[in-house]
């Protein structure tokens, strides 16, 4: 039954629907009012270019235009699970009034053009439709589908996902050839270079990249596996931000730094475009290396967020003074600072197999703009199907363990709730995630994936769960 449902939604019209985005989205202005119940996080488009080994001077001249598109459909189900009680932001059983089905459908056009020497412009109109379990994105520290929204969005909504300018300044070194791809024009560049991007995009387009786990449309779907779960990256309620990113490529090293806007009120659409009051600063250093003849990379990230947020301790103190349950929504008294760091490692074992690992941490004293995670460790592996004559298939297996701070634990134990979690009580244990998937290439550009996730202590509550999630995903790209 599940297979019939997803296959019925794949159909050949996916390509036509994807391309048809260009017309309606260009008509819709970004100034249109947007329902705040919108995307939590957008699937990233990696900024690190795909580079051929060396540029050949007789190659074609720089590409002037680029058009690509994608469409992804994900359907999921969950089992009934142990649930002695629940609260306002709990993941619910079907018997408790929550549907056991969830789906997402996205379609994006990636349009690019060369403006001048080293100058490029990119625009991404996008469509989204879908709903989380029960219509609200609640009940987990790290959600099981990276394309999920904060609320139901039926019928589809159209919007401008990205619109930004990129300027590349050569600094010498060997000449390399950048391959054509989404938000990437083909052409020669200096291996040592400075790249500046300005406009609207997603934070994860630039930061926390990993070859083996970075895109929920094609790889692992759980937030704690395709990203640093404790990284408080800048994002409005749709998962996008505004700002400036600088990238310095020098030999085997890459340094990235950015100031990016966050909402003036947490988890809304209103970004502070001044970049002087509500923002996130982040710096990431990457080193590319070879280990036993196989490529790998190590990335270190530091971030600092300043925004109008409540602290858990202020909410607890206010609740005690008023004799009420603590509530972060009534304890936003001014600007707060949240900071943290992360480590990201990828390593090829051979041409078909790769390993990845991430560690991230934040101080966890304030409400979150992203996920209710203050510390997270994840690792896993992916394997191509060459050994069974399916070289474009991929199987993945990953594990993550997430935690929250002592102040958030105390807040939740007193009956408080955040944007995403709150069971009215809490028997704290770390949330654990096991995910495995198999992605099969059924046509040249069409991939079908089966996904399974087992989550223990959902929303850090040992009194509830574990929960099993079953998913099917169809992804097409042109």
Sequence positions of predicted segments:
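N-terminal periplasmic/intermembrane-space "pro-region" immediately following the signal or transit peptide
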Residues: 2, 7, 21-99, 110, ...
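Outer-membrane beta-barrel "beta-signal"
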Residues: 35-38, 162-174, 397, 466-478
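Residues that define the transmembrane beta-barrel architecture of outer-membrane proteins
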Residues: 63, 101-107, 156-161, 238-242, ...
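Residues on the lipid-exposed face of transmembrane beta-strands in outer-membrane beta-barrel proteins
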Residues: 69, 107-113, 163-167, 198, ...
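Transmembrane beta-barrel strands of outer-membrane/channel proteins
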Residues: 71-75, 123-127, 196-200, 257-261, ...
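Surface-exposed coil loops of outer-membrane beta-barrel proteins
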Residues: 137-155, 159, 172-280, 284, ...
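Outer membrane beta-barrel transmembrane domains
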Residues: 284-286, 301-335, 356, 363, ...
